[in-house]
Amino acid sequence: MKNFVLFVYLCIVCFGSGAFGQTGKYDIIVGGHKVGEFTTGKIEKGDTIVYKLQSKASVHLFVETTITYHLTSIYVKEKLIESTNKTYKNGDLHSSTTVKWSNGQYTIIKNGHTTTLDSPITFTSAALYFSEPSGVNRVFSESAGFYNKIEKNDTDNYSVINADNHHVSHYTYEDGTPTKVEIEHHLFDFTLMKNN
């Protein structure tokens, strides 16, 4: 356990310094204009995988608004053990979700509300940026705290349907990673375009 904690700490330090095992960088596009950047990182050692997703965008929502997003997900033996997701609006915490496996179940805390889940989570939103979900029919959203449906549309193209509001995100893959992600959002739709 001590070695696991040390590994996770080192992963977070490495992620903070930009030393990722696998990385991706995307432009965030709204209305045809670049408004920010989205970065992805994955590092693995033995049977432990750590994913980190980060973004920062400035959009006009009646006034100029800067939105930052941070997600860290830790898997051990292909099972989610812990994730932390925080979104900030103009520097103030806007939403927070934590998921933690302990004593045979997950405790999910979203904005102060707690739920539990008994079955192991093996595929999450963070993993979508590093592996094509071939044969997968649902994905756990670390930010929402629940499962969303995945549908394969055609070769290398998938839809993720939000179980709460039925918004649809489209993922287009090339060589196992998404090159384009179109996201339907209640405030505005946006697109992630891979640029490396």
Which residues make up each language-model segment?
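Positively charged n-region of N-terminal signal peptides that target proteins for export
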Residues: 1-5
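Intrinsically disordered, low-complexity segments enriched in small/polar residues
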Residues: 7, 24, 49, 67, ...
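N-terminal helix-cap/turn-to-beta initiation motif at the start of protein domains
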Residues: 19-21
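Solvent-exposed helix/loop surface patches that form functional interfaces
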Residues: 31, 81-195
